[in-house]
Swiss-Prot record:
A GO term, aspect molecular function: tRNA binding
Coiled-coil region list: none
Domain of life: Bacteria
InterPro entries: Ribosom_uL1_bac-type, Ribosomal_uL1, Ribosomal_uL1-like, Ribosomal_uL1/biogenesis, Ribosomal_uL1_3-a/b-sand, Ribosomal_uL1_CS
Identification of the protein by name: Large ribosomal subunit protein uL1
Function: Binds directly to 23S rRNA. The L1 stalk is quite mobile in the ribosome, and is involved in E site tRNA release. Protein L1 is also a translational repressor protein, it controls the translation of the L11 operon by binding to its mRNA.
Organism placement in taxonomy: Bacteria, Bacillati, Actinomycetota, Actinomycetes, Micrococcales
């Protein structure tokens, strides 16, 4: 048995599959079972009671994690002229117009988020085959199609992330790193949960959050009690 599988089995043995854990409890279990070889990413996964095939039940949005993701995002900006200079000044990793569009069309995707000015979306829109499946296509709804490219870059670098339910009604969102303290992870999770709840489609009937699970990279899933939305870090939170 490999060391990795031993660590997984040990972490999994500490989880009671017949109960739902309060967020603080789940975070403690996740941190305790995280790999010591690298700083694991901590992620929450929701199974939603929606039908993503219906346009009015597509859950998509953005959230500003109060403690960031633990990773400095690489941001690419499609802009020219003054807006391009503003993007560079704000810390964008790559900025450009036609040449950058051609580079991405050729398969270049070494970035975590893309921003575009509205005037270039006619050309950027043709990159759907490359950007769409990776969730990287700029979109007005997530604030990534904008003339204020500097603000968009700063927000993404500061911990703003976007999320979108997949075709199986699953939603995966990063809430930080295992090295974060408990409070930071719980507060990041709370921000994600609040936004997911706010985005509940009016046409979605019945149970909205069917299942919620917290996990680390290569770690076991920990069943979450998503009904807990208040006092998540207080003395009686666990």
């Amino acid at each position: 048995m490999t060391a990795q599988s031993k660590n997984y089995r040990k972490a999994a043995s500490a989880i009671d599959r017949d109960r739902l854990y309060a967020p603080l409890e789940a975070v403690r279990l996740a941190k305790a079972g995280a790999s010591t070889k690298f700083d694991s990413t901590v992620e929450v996964a929701f199974r939603l009671g929606v039908d993503p095939r219906k346009a009015d039940q597509m859950v998509r949005g953005t959230v500003n994690l109060p403690h960031g993701t633990g990773k400095t995002a690489r941001v690419l900006v499609f802009a020219v002229g003054e807006r391009a200079e503003q993007a560079r000044a704000a810390g964008a990793d790559e900025v450009g117009g036609d040449e950058l569009i051609e580079k991405v069309a050729g398969g270049y995707v070494d970035f975590d988020a893309a921003v575009a000015t509205p005037d270039l979306m006619g050309k950027v829109g043709r990159l759907g085959r490359v950007l769409g499946p990776r969730g990287l296509m700029p979109n007005p709804r997530t604030g990534t199609v904008t003339m204020d490219v500097a603000k968009a870059v700063e927000e993404i670098k500061g911990g703003k992330i976007d999320f979108r339910v997949d075709k199986h009604a699953n939603l995966h969102v990063v809430v930080g790193k295992a090295s974060f303290d408990e409070t930071a992870l719980v507060e990041n999770y709370a921000s994600v949960l609040d936004e997911v709840l706010r985005l509940k489609p009016s046409s979605s009937k019945g149970r909205y959050i069917v299942k919620a699970t917290l996990s680390t990279t290569m770690g076991p899933g920990i069943p979450l009690d998503a009904s807990k939305t208040r006092n998540l870090t207080g003395e009686d939170a666990a």
